[in-house]
Amino acid sequence: MAWEYETFGPDGQCKLFGVNIFNYDWQTTGKRVKVQDPIYHQDHTFEVWQVEIDGKMRRFAAGEFSNCVWGFYLEKNG
């Protein structure tokens, strides 16, 4: 599986899966993935998380690109 950049935003204010992802309880999966900043092309290792939104489990990779600026990646098939 590949991880593709989805969005970024300031701490506490980022929409993912149509909701403010910071309003949900992130559960770690214990996995980490290597991703690349889409603007500066720096490599990062982000943790993979899961959240339950409207009864459905969603997975994403997230971490800070810089202080309080978060990047989010989604797993893509093929």
Where are the predicted features?
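Acidic, low-complexity, intrinsically disordered interaction modules
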Residues: 16-77
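N-terminal trafficking/processing presequences and adjacent post-cleavage segments
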Residues: 1-19
